[in-house]
Every structure is written in C-alpha cells, then in structure tokens.
Amino acid sequence: MKKILPLVIIAPLLISCSSSKNKAENEAYIKDTNGFDILMGQFAHNIENLWGLNEVLIAGPKDYVKYTDQYETRSHINFDAGTITVETIAGDNPSAHLRQAIISTLLMGNDPGTIDLYSDADYIPISKEPFLYGQVLDNNGEPIRWEWHAAHFADYLLQTRLQTRTTGLRQIWSITIQLVPNHLDKRAHKYLGMVRKASQQYGVDQSLILAIMQTESSFNPYAVSHADALGLMQVVQHSAGRDVFKMKGKWGQPSRSYLFDPENNIDTGTAYLAMLQNSYLGGIVNPTSRRYAVITAYNGGAGSVLRVFSRDQNRAFQIINGMPPDQVYQTLSTQHPSAESRRYLYKVNNLQKNYRR
C-alpha cells in the first residue's frame, strides 16, 4: 500500500493540473480570438470611415493590402490575378502619395513580420532583395531592385497610367501594375529548398506541400485570413499550430511572428500534414485513399472526414478501407458537409498532379 498511496494522492492532482491547463488554454484562445475580432472590427471601421462601405479592402490569403498615410493610401497585390493596384484618396498632392506607395511596395522585403497589415503604419522596410524582384518588370523590361530604379518607374507610371474614379463624395487616384506571367512560379521557387527539407523530415510528398501552398496562399508569405490563419500554408495557431507544438514537446502554441517566418510556417504545416497522414488518419490503409482524406482534413479537420463515412471512428476506417480510392474520392467530393472542403479536395488533387510532372 505504501507504494500505491502516493499514486492515489497524485492522480487527482494530475487530473486537476490537466484540467486547469486545458481551461487556461481555452481561456487564452477565447481571449486571443476576441482580441483579434475587436482589432479587425476597428480596422474595418477606420477604413470605412474614409473610403466608404463599398471600398473596404482588407488583406486575405491571396491579397496583400497595406494602408498608409492615416488610411488614405493603400497598396493591393492580388496574387491570383497577378496585379498591383496602388490607390489614394489624399486630396493634397495625390501623385506624391502614390509615388511613395509604389516605391515601398516594389522594394518591400521577404519578412512578413516587419509589416503590420492591420494598421496604417507608414514604416515599410526596404530590402536589398525585394520580395517582388523578378515578379515586376519596368517599362524597359528590367527587374527592379534599387530605390532609384523604383522611383524612376513610379514616375513613368504616374505620367502614363494614372487613373481616377469617384465613389460617393471621394475621388480615388490609382495606378495598376501587372506582374509577370510566371509570377506564381517565381514565388514558388523561393521556397523549394524549405519544402524539400520539410518533406524529407516528415515524410510528406513535396508535390502535396506545394499544391496546398498554392491553394492556401498562392505562395504569399503575408497571407492572413478572417479566421486568423497565417502564412504560406495558412496555419491556425490554436489548432494545427498547437497540435504540432504538442507533438514536438513544446508548450502552448506558435506566435504570429513564428508562423509568419516562411521556414517555420512550412515546417509547421508539413508537420501537421504528417500528423494527419500518420496519426489522425493513419488507419486508412490505401495510400491514395489516405491522401484524399488528408487533403480534405487539412481544410476541414480529420473528424469531419471520418464522419462522412460513419460517426464511429473505427467503423469509418473499416468502410474507407473497403472502398477503392476512386470511391473514397467520390464520396468526399460529393458528401462532405462543407462545400469549401469539397472544392478544396478537387483543387489540391489537380494541382498535385501538376507538381508531380
């Protein structure tokens, strides 16, 4: 009894500590979420007050949007469309405001942690290796690296491409710049080394990582979402981020700055794919069927994938393992309750085929 007694005494303490830990984590998550919602609400309100309701534009997974000049000027990179649009409502010398915004956007660096997309802070650090280098060419077909070069191109754009439009009582001055046709490939190339490293470390196919990165962010390291998913692989701190930290023996969850670092983001996103592949959905025997399930789960969660087949987890695995892969794909792409997850499987699966070629 003497050896058992301490365990009996300690067990309730362990349960209590675990319960307290979970409670603290839940409270921290609620606090973070509420804080983010308040921040976003105030941010959108500030924009609406100046630009009007129909002109509210906020950064997203495939849209870089940065406000400056007390919210009167903004730069928008649409990574899907391959365009940069710089706009201002500043009535006092709008060309000067546009010129500075064009220069700052063309020369901004690769570190998303240095730029606050949820404020009107004017500071945008200029990099020796701009993020957009090679993705934008000047009027002579040359890539832009230096400040004098960006300034000359900005002057050319202001002389030849300045446009105006009216919204409500506001006049908006704008410049639109096209990215090069293969801008997506140029961004993807920046991260191939990181993808190879994560692929080898976690045993996840490179083509799957790249397909998910393209689907989630179009290789935009500044990617954010309304759900506060962050970075290239759109990792959510309190779910996938927390799961990966726990798997690595780390306390808590990754910070925003941690996930905005491209290498950390790719590592965390790939580690989560490995957890889906080897743990949460490891009961699926056929690798192709498991891949379909992993893709869908990265978007909508492993639990929702299994519930498509049965509410009982073991039974769900049995049903999936009794199906050919094509039937698993058909079931997930037509019967998953989330239309977004159904589209996600279709898109990632097709993109992965391209990356395998």
Swiss-Prot record:
CDD domains assigned: LT_MltC_MltE (cd16893)
Described purpose of this protein according to its UniProt entry: Murein-degrading enzyme. May play a role in recycling of muropeptides during cell elongation and/or cell division.
Enzyme class, first EC level, given as a word: lyase
Topology relative to the membrane: Lipid-anchor
Location (main, coarse): membrane
Annotated signal peptide: 1-16
Lipidation feature positions (N-palmitoyl cysteine): C17
Any single GO CC term annotated in Swiss-Prot or TrEMBL for this entry: cell outer membrane
Family matches, as PANTHER family: MEMBRANE-BOUND LYTIC MUREIN TRANSGLYCOSYLASE C, SOLUBLE LYTIC MUREIN TRANSGLYCOSYLASE-RELATED
Protein name in UniProt: Membrane-bound lytic murein transglycosylase C
The keyword Cell wall biogenesis/degradation appears for this protein: yes
One MF term in the entry's GO annotations: peptidoglycan lytic transglycosylase activity
Subcellular location, record wording: Cell outer membrane
Keywords: Cell outer membrane, Cell wall biogenesis/degradation, Lipoprotein, Lyase, Membrane, Palmitate, Signal
